[in-house]
Amino acid sequence: LKFFSLLCLFIFHSDLKAKGIIEIIRENPNLSIFYSYINNTELEATLQQKYPWNWTIFVPNNKAFDALPKKVYDQILSDTSLRKMLILDHILIGQKSSNDLKSKITQEVTVTNKSIQLYKRESLYVKDMVVENENTSADNGVIHEINCVMFVQPSQEDDRLTKLQKDKFPITSCCMQTDNEINSWLSSVNSRF
């Protein structure tokens, strides 16, 4: 019986590992909104291809999208290019599981060339965000489910922080919730083009 249980566990784990990140996201009902945006921005095909690297994706769950202000839907998610940029802000090249991180802060770069800070205490954190379900492994990367849609900015532009916090954390990420955050994100995207 013990051998059979271990065999079943191995087969189940192997089956999960054999799936790609897109397949895992598509099959998770809590991530269906994020999946629909990946699908609508043609990122699905890109993320399914085999590359010499893996991906790390911080996937906002459906509750995160439900909590977004209407302005995000009206001005960002309704525009194909902006929607794609917002989704890409949640993706890193390379596989970063919580097991790879020490308790110190690690700075990583998204595929849109924005720095984010990751750290781990008991759980994995993206600065100011809680990772609700970490380290879902796929054959081409790892998925971390987060509780909000990320907004990444230089700390000097974050009015919520003290000077000491701005000096200690040069990059801040938070949940996109206010008009100021939405306008800052739009401004940063527009300044790139």
For each feature predicted by the language model, list its residue ranges.
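Mature, structured domains of secreted/extracytosolic soluble proteins
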Residues: D15-F193
